[in-house]
UniProtKB/Swiss-Prot annotation:
Cytoplasmic face of the membrane: 41-49, 114-133, 208-235, 290-314
InterPro entries in UniProt: GPCR_Rhodpsn_7TM, Vmron_rcpt_1
The protein's name in its UniProt record: Vomeronasal type-1 receptor 98
Highest taxon listed in the record's lineage: Eukaryota
Keyword Secreted among UniProt keywords: no
Segments on the Extracellular face: 1-19, 71-92, 155-186, 257-268
Residues carrying a glycan: N158
Recorded GO CC terms: plasma membrane
Organism per entry: Rattus norvegicus
GO biological process: response to pheromone; sensory perception of chemical stimulus
PANTHER family with a match to the protein in the record: VOMERONASAL TYPE-1 RECEPTOR
């Protein structure tokens, strides 16, 4: 393991990383508290509130755990093998839940917006039940592929060893043989391709439905639709932003992870992976909050009243 890795990350990445974690914890806390507040106030919940609230809770737990693990980036905590395996596996587990929750949300939106004539309409009455089973199954499948962490993660005993892949000052990964590396790379590629492909298909299906609906409405009314976006259009745009950002970050993370197995001990790759791995959990709640009319409309109304009051006082 290259000791320059810790020095490089400590010098250039520490402030940025903790700033990213802090923003993510704040954003996910606001999103989760907003849904809890709406539930307590007795507002009728939307069908997507549960998946979004679950995703915010998962991201919050993942970022809190990442913040605790991050302390070991810059000051050794003296963890043993069991502690290293537990923390690293839990972090990967929450990342798996994050991916599965995003996939579940995209599929859920597709089922909600599909017309009654669609084959997917038969899943509407029991969609929460089916999606809960789907989420549990995909989480187990997704996490099982990362189960090698329970073997590969060990406590770092020798700081000068060049055969270990650096994680934190207390923990490292044992190097894998070429055959095992190819096997896990294939499984990881299949796992990511399946979930990203499923999200892409659901998003394209919703976009097609909305385009058909818009064309049909224009023909019936013989006039242009109102420029104001409908709730369905806002939902599809939010999901498109989700999908695009998730796809970009997943691609970057996969490339960096594969590059680290080739260029072991490269500090710049490791520091980049730290930031990329948590970027989706930081940005996604802000995308939801910015497109949440139940939050933005009262804030806009409050701002307009304040501006009007200032104008009258002036």
């Amino acid at each position: 393991m290259n000791k320059d890795t810790t020095m490089y990350c400590s010098a250039y990445i520490r402030d940025v990383f903790f700033c990213e974690i802090g923003v993510g914890i704040s954003a996910n806390s606001c999103l989760l508290l907003f849904h809890i507040f709406m539930f307590i106030r007795g507002h009728r919940p939307r069908l997507t509130d549960l998946p979004i609230g679950l995703m915010a809770l998962i991201h919050l737990l993942m970022l809190l755990l990442a913040a605790y693990i991050a302390k070991d980036f810059f000051m050794s905590s003296g963890w043993d093998d069991i502690t290293c395996k537990l923390f690293i596996f839990l972090h990967r587990f929450f990342r798996s839940l994050s991916v599965c929750a995003t996939c579940m949300l995209s599929v859920f939106q597709t089922i909600i917006l599909c017309p009654q004539s669609s084959h997917l309409a038969k899943f509407k009455p029991n969609s929460p039940y089916h999606l809960s089973c789907f989420f549990i199954f995909m989480s187990i499948f997704y996490t099982s592929i990362s189960s090698h962490i329970l073997i590969a993660a060990i406590a770092t005993q020798n700081l000068t060893s060049v055969n270990l892949i650096y994680i934190t000052k207390s923990c490292s990964f044992l190097p894998m043989s070429s055959s095992m590396q190819r096997t896990f790379s294939t499984l990881l590629a299949f796992r990511n391709a399946f979930l990203i492909g499923l999200m892409g298909l659901s998003t394209c299906y919703m976009a097609t439905l909305l385009c058909r609906h818009k064309t049909r409405s224009q023909r019936l009314q013989n006039s242009k639709l109102s420029p104001k976006a409908t709730p369905e259009q806002r939902a599809i745009w939010t999901l498109l932003m989700f999908m695009s950002f998730f796809l970009v970050m997943s691609t970057f993370d996969s490339i960096i992870s594969y590059s680290r197995t080739i260029f072991q001990g490269n500090p710049s790759l490791y520091c980049a992976q730290i930031l990329v791995a948590h970027s989706y959990a930081v940005v996604s709640p802000m995308l939801v909050l910015s497109n949440e009319n139940r939050l933005t409309n009262p804030l806009i109304s409050m701002y307009e009243r304040i501006v009007r009051l200032d104008f009258l006082c002036w």
